Amino acid sequence: MILYQALSSYQILECIVHRQVYHREEKCILILGTYITERMPRYRELETKKLFDEVYLFRFGGYRGSEEKIIREVGEELRKTLPYDIRSFEKILAAGIHTYLQVYLISGKIPFEMFEDGSGALSRPWILAEIHRKSAPGRYSLIEQYGLYDHRSPLITKKYCDMRSQEPDFEDERAVDFQVMERFRELPERMQKEVRGVFDVPELEGEADAVLLLTQQFANLGQLSLEGQISIYRHLFDYYLRGRKVLIKPPSGRYPVL
């Protein structure tokens, strides 16, 4: 029995594809954050379409107090959420390891495998670490202490990543090349269609002249001012996208056509 964890849409896709490639015939459980009900209303289709055998919602946030108190409460929440002993899984694969759940696993000497947070992120751990250091310094301190930003914990046994997108001098003996989109395209067409449906991704046939703009929350994450973020998109439209049909994917996952 295999346990997957995902926090974002991209990470859910990583888990779906990995399961289809490596563990298609095994019983696979998926843990998502409770907030997924708003971000991904069709998340239950992950189970009904048999992309995973069972899906459970775990409260990743809202823990306060000392390190010992947080670890204890996370363990209690996990036992309420998951009808299995966490140690009964053959493998645990976590996408988005900067959480108190991974602190709990490491404190209990429970090994797990990880996925990078985005293409090329494994060799650039400072990006996410700096965002969290500014936005949640208390949480950052504890998670950094457990080696979850730079992935140095020896209990992380494998690190799935896009090797082509890493820094030129990147080396890690635990890194495993995992090209998410290439592997996705290798899946049967029926499976690809079902996955797109879960994410509400439209068919783009006949849109050869269209541009898909993938947006980021730079301002909300403290990486840019709101004015700076607006300036980026204004320059894109003024100098590169004028007269083009643009499909904008906001962080919410919707795809309006402008």
Predicted regions and their residues:
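Extreme N-terminal starter segment of soluble prokaryotic enzymes
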Residues: M1-L3
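Catalytic donor nucleotide-activated moiety binding site of glycosyltransferases and closely related
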Residues: Y240-L258
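A nucleotide-sugar donor-handling region in carbohydrate enzymes
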Residues: I131-F218
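Residue-level signal for short, function-critical loop segments
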Residues: T34, G118, Q217-A219, S252
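Active-site and donor-binding regions of nucleotide-sugar-utilizing enzymes
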Residues: Q5-H151, L155
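Well-ordered, non-membrane alpha-helical segments in soluble/globular domains
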Residues: L13-I16, I71-K80, S225-Y239, L258
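A generic structural signal for short coil/turn motifs at secondary-structure boundaries
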Residues: N220-L224
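Short boundary motifs at domain starts and secondary-structure transition points
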Residues: R19-V21, T81-D85, V198-E207, F237-D238
